C-alpha cells in the first residue's frame, strides 16, 4: 500500500494530540508565564525556589526514588520467576498482575487506607492476637507502600518482555563456555534486559514523582508532595498562574529524567554494564 495514500489515517491521532496534549500544554504555559493581570512574568516559575516548594519537590523525588528502587528489586526476581514458568502458566500469572489495574486507581488506594488506618484491618488483627497497634497511616512509609502497590505492574511487564527476548540458546552457550550462574546473569541476562529495566524505571518514577492522590489518602495533611502543592494551587488557592508555573518546572524535571534514562538505555543496550 502506498504510504502517501495512507497518511490520512494519522489524521484522527493528530487531532486527538492537538486537542488533548498540545493545546492544554500551551494553556499551562500561558498561565505559568503570566500573572493574574495577563502580563508576562517568570515569578511563577521562580517560585519553585521557595523553601516550601523546594521541600515538597525534594520529598517527592526522595519517595519516588525509594518506590522505584523497591519496585525494581521486587519486579526483576519476579519477572525471572515468571519467565521460568511453563508457557501455559505464564499467561495466567501475567493476567493476575494486570487484573488489579482493571480496578479504579482511586478505589485501590482507598482500600489501602482502610487497611492501614488506626482502626483498620491490620491493626484490628494485631489487637486480636494481643499485639500493640502500629502507626502506619499518614506516614512516608504508607505513601511508598501505595506507590509500590499501584505502580509495580509497570515495572514487572517491561522487564518480563525484555527477559523473554533473551534466547535460552544464548544462556546455554554462556554456560557451555564455562560461565557460572552469577557470571551468566551479570554478563548476559542483565545487560540484555537493560532496556526493559530503563523503561520500567521511567514508567514508575514519573507517576510516583507527580502523584497527589496517594499522598492525599495515605499521607494526609502531614506530608505534602509537589503534586499536592500544585493541586492545592489550582483547587484551594485558585491561583492557576502559580500552579501552572510550578507545573512547568516539574515538567522540565520529568523531561530531564526521561532524557537521562534514554541516554543510559542507548549506551547500555546489548552491552555489558561494567
Describe every region a protein language model picked out.
Residues 2-7, 58, 88-91, 140-142, ...:
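Amphipathic cytosolic juxtamembrane alpha-helices at the membrane-cytosol interface
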Residues 3-13, 23, 27, 160-175, ...:
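C-terminal transmembrane helix and the adjacent membrane-cytosol boundary/short C-terminal tail
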Residues 4, 45-52, 212, 216-266:
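Interhelical loop and adjacent transmembrane-helix boundary motif
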Residues 11, 15-54, 115-119, 220, ...:
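Short membrane-interfacial helix/loop motifs at transmembrane-helix boundaries
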Residues 12-21, 95, 99, 149, ...:
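Transmembrane alpha-helices
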Residues 51-84:
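Transmembrane alpha-helix signature in integral membrane proteins
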Amino acid at each position: 500500500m502506498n504510504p502517501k495514500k495512507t497518511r490520512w489515517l494519522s489524521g484522527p491521532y493528530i487531532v486527538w494530540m492537538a486537542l488533548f496534549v498540545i493545546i492544554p500544554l500551551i494553556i499551562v504555559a500561558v498561565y505559568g508565564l503570566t500573572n493574574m493581570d495577563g502580563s508576562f512574568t517568570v515569578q511563577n516559575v521562580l517560585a519553585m525556589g521557595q523553601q516550601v516548594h523546594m521541600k515538597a519537590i525534594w520529598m517527592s523525588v526522595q519517595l519516588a526514588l525509594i518506590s522505584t528502587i523497591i519496585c525494581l528489586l521486587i519486579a526483576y526476581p519476579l519477572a525471572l520467576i515468571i519467565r521460568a514458568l511453563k508457557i501455559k502458566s505464564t499467561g495466567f500469572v501475567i493476567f493476575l498482575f494486570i487484573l488489579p489495574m482493571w480496578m479504579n486507581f482511586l478505589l485501590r488506594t482507598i482500600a489501602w487506607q482502610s487497611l492501614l488506618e488506626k482502626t483498620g484491618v491490620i491493626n484490628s488483627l494485631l489487637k486480636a492476637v494481643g499485639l500493640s497497634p502500629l502507626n502506619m497511616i499518614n506516614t512516608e512509609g504508607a505513601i511508598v507502600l501505595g506507590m509500590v502497590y499501584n505502580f509495580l505492574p509497570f515495572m514487572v511487564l517491561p522487564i518480563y518482555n525484555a527477559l523473554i527476548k533473551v534466547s535460552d540458546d544464548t544462556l546455554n552457550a554462556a554456560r557451555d563456555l564455562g560461565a557460572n550462574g552469577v557470571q551468566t546473569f551479570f554478563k548476559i541476562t542483565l545487560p540484555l534486559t537493560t532496556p526493559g529495566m530503563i523503561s520500567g524505571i521511567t514508567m514508575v518514577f514519573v507517576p510516583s514523582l507527580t502523584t497527589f492522590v496517594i499522598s492525599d489518602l495515605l499521607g494526609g495533611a502531614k506530608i505534602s508532595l509537589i503534586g499536592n502543592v500544585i493541586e492545592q494551587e489550582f483547587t484551594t488557592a485558585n491561583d492557576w498562574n502559580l500552579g501552572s508555573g510550578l507545573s512547568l518546572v516539574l515538567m522540565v524535571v520529568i523531561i530531564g529524567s526521561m532524557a537521562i534514562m534514554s541516554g543510559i538505555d542507548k549506551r547500555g543496550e546489548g552491552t555489558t554494564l561494567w
